[in-house]
């Protein structure tokens, strides 16, 4: 998991007028971490700059958590639900904050403008200029949208510049399509979304998702088949524009194997499984099927009649529902990870452990070694050691310093360093002649050399 170098945010009212001073601050990288060179190429923030300007991750997490936890806050970004929010959860997890509560307690919520823009293009495109990428499909990259619509966004991927660009695009959608904007804002709430979903009748819905691809405007009609057997926030949806053959012909095990096979690895005669999970706690775009007007369906290349024919097939074959429930009853294949930093999703913390986390937060750094806490969760002890080592290394005794050095040697091993150097070499060949990029790559090389010794 990448670690953040910079945070930027600003509080606005519901009309996107800025009502507080913007916040911009940096995070100093820990000494057991080599930054992702690709990320540095995009942001332009070298690890040396982050070290010079940044606070430690504990303070970085505290400031973000404080801003996010103000009652009534809605956290809005651009692709934040799939990217930024994951980074936030992980730094909260490593810093002993509840990784989830900030986004729902005290009337708080989150929302993502990326899917709002996709929905606007698919359903109500008027009033916004939609740029195309080199393949002739609409581009939803923030810098492309701002340029096409005359929005100032001089330093794309600079965090504060991206914040202002996101605000400007949100204002534009609200102005151009106020009814759609308000509908999507109201339906960021999982209880509102839940009310749309009728599994018993398989009532079709319009769904916007990047998984559908730009060729059809990231849009389709879907039918809810069943709730996920283990995750109460996930509903199993069938893409009605897909080929129903696999659902009819394959058993649950065969469906599972094909579902988790990359599309470019399927044989020419193997249709993809037209199934996806929709997580109602991740602000998905769902609306009644009629929201996709015939003229917009035609523009996007979606055959509404074919979708209705497929819906008829689903209703005539109740065994399909049983198969997809069985498919998801067995966990998706994954590689277990022994690294405690990567174990955020290994389970929720107990109330007793949450109480211990609050004690850790309230304890002065110099008093952390003397804490005598009992944890029921196996992750907590190692997390606390790493928290001290990264943020307050002067609190480690001699044995702990040796232990941390061993951890660093294991993480920054020869294989990891070789991979880092190969990545730098590849980027050097890609950007040869670009002075700015060369300077960034030199900084990354120097930092790696200094870190590994």
Identify the residue ranges that each predicted region occupies:
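Short acidic, Gly/Ser-rich segments with clustered Asp/Glu that frequently serve as metal-coordination loops
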Residues: 1
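Metal-dependent phosphoesterase core characteristic of DEDDh/y 3'-5' exonuclease domains
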Residues: 4-5, 11-12, 17-43, 66-178, ...
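Metal-dependent phosphoesterase signature
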Residues: 43-60, 67
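Conserved, well-structured beta-alpha core segment at the onset of a catalytic domain
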Residues: 54-55, 63, 70, 451-453
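Short, glycine/acidic-rich hinge or "gate" loops at secondary-structure transitions
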Residues: 160, 179-191
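Acidic catalytic cores of enzymes that act on phosphate-bearing nucleotides/polynucleotides
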Residues: 186-266
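Long, charge-rich C-terminal accessory regions
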Residues: 229-407
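C-terminal non-catalytic accessory extensions
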Residues: 400-453
């Amino acid at each position: 998991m990448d670690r953040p170098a910079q945070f930027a945010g600003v509080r606005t009212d519901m009309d996107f007028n800025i009502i507080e001073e913007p916040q911009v601050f940096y995070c100093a990288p820990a000494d057991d971490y080599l930054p992702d060179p690709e990320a540095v190429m995009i942001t332009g923030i070298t690890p040396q700059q982050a070290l010079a300007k940044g606070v430690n991750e504990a303070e970085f997490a505290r400031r973000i958590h404080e801003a996010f936890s103000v009652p009534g806050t809605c956290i809005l970004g651009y692709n934040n639900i799939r990217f930024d929010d994951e980074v936030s959860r992980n730094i909260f997890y490593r810093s002993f904050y509840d990784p989830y509560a900030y986004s729902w307690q005290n009337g708080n919520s989150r929302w993502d403008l990326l899917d709002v823009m996709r929905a606007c293009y698919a359903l109500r495109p008027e009033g916004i200029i939609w740029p195309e990428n080199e393949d002739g499909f609409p581009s939803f990259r923030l810098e492309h949208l701002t340029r096409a619509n005359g929005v100032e966004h001089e330093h794309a991927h600079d965090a504060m510049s991206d914040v202002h660009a996101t605000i400007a695009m949100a204002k534009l959608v609200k102005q151009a399509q106020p009814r759609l904007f308000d509908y999507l804002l109201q339906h960021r709430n999982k209880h509102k979304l839940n009310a749309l979903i009728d599994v018993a009748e398989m009532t079709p819905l319009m769904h916007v998702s990047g998984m559908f691809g730009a060729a059809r405007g990231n849009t389709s009609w879907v039918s809810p088949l069943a709730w996920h057997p283990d995750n109460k926030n996930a509903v199993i949806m069938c893409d009605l524009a897909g080929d129903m053959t696999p659902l009819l012909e394959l058993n649950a095990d065969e469906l599972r194997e094909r579902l988790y096979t990359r599309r470019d690895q399927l044989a020419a005669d193997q249709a993809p499984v037209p199934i996806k999970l929709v997580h109602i706690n991740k602000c998905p775009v769902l609306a009644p099927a009629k929201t996709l007007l015939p003229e917009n369906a035609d523009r996007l290349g979606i055959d509404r009649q074919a979708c209705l024919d497929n819906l008829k097939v689903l209703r005539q074959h109740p065994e399909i529902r049983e198969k997809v429930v069985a498919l998801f009853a067995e966990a998706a294949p994954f590689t277990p990870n022994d690294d405690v930093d990567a174990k955020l999703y290994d389970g929720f913390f107990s109330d007793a452990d949450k109480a211990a986390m609050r004690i850790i937060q309230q304890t002065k750094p110099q008093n952390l070694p003397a804490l005598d806490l009992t944890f029921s969760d196996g992750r907590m002890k190692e997390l606390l050691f790493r928290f001290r080592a990264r943020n307050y290394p002067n609190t480690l005794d001699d044995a702990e310093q040796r232990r941390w050095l061993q951890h660093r040697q294991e993480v920054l091993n020869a294989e990891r360093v070789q991979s880092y150097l190969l990545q730098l070499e590849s980027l050097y060949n890609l950007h040869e002649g670009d002075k700015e990029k060369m300077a960034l790559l030199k900084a990354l090389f120097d930092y790696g050399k200094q870190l590994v010794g």
